[in-house]
From Swiss-Prot:
Its EC number is 1.1.1.-. One of its GO terms (cellular component) is cytosol. It comes from Schizosaccharomyces pombe (strain 972 / ATCC 24843) (Fission yeast). This is Putative uncharacterized oxidoreductase C513.07. Gene3D superfamilies: NAD(P)-binding Rossmann-like Domain.
Amino acid sequence: MSGKLVLVTGVTGFIGAHVAEQLLQAGYRVRGTVRSMEKADELIRLNPGLKDKIEFVIVKDVSASNAFDGVLKDVELICHIASPFFVENVTDNKSQLLDPAVKGTLGILEAAQGVKSIKRIVITSSFAAVGNFQIDPHNNKVYTEKDWNPITYEEALTTDNGIVAYCASKKLAEEAAREYVKEKKPSYDICTINPPYVYGPPIHPMKNMDSLNTSNQIFWKLIDGSKEATPFYYYYVDVRDVAAAHVFALENAKLSNGRMLVSKGVFTTGDICKVLRKEFPNKSDVIAEPVDITVDPSFFKLDNSFSKSLGFKYHSDEECYVDTAKKLWERAEEFK
């Protein structure tokens, strides 16, 4: 156990909470940024095993200048996860998505520049920074870590598509981080983790089921009793694997200034319903009817072979679907 101190930004978020939990299991010490101590208290209430194990510090806005003043003392490694995720009701791409994502990422890099103890910053990016979301996805394209979303800043400013703007924010933030390291040559290096849709058990504070992360909202609609099984398929990864990738990347020499696409494969809403109806026959009244969905052979490919070549392993589809459903039903009971 190394006992190195890791700063986790956004520690009370969907991914951040899992990252903190896995860091502690791996023997690291964790300092987590929160917007309020109420959020920190709620995280501990939901996960009593984390009690007295995380040092919480308040950072109200990670994109504010000097947001990390006094937060980085003795830190050796950083997992920078906090970032906006608004897709609906975006009225100003620049102020709601682009600026916060870029400033939040550059802010942590700039703050870390003067802290010689920091050796690596692992940044939560996204497949959104990799793929081209302005073309038909049925294009036979194979995406790897070498690919970049081709959208420009100017296009991102003017698009009225919230999803395209969000994807642009992830691309621009990652691009800015890599440019910064290239130009400033800090004492640390960086690595990005690039997941597609992220499913998995939510262990973080939530206001209600409507505040689920965007991916899990799709999953919840399949099992919330509304029986809404909209035929849909896409690439996904378990949140526990996203968290494991952050921990994996912190001290892996092969990921110095690298990039790691993490994806289990393609899910279909029909497959999710089939697995869950088999596993939970007593829940058939709330699980949507499975719809047979064929994935078009021309649908783009997300190549995860680099992560596998490093020895990284993924949860099975069944583990992800079953564990996610159990936790979602459990959390729904909280809000009744």
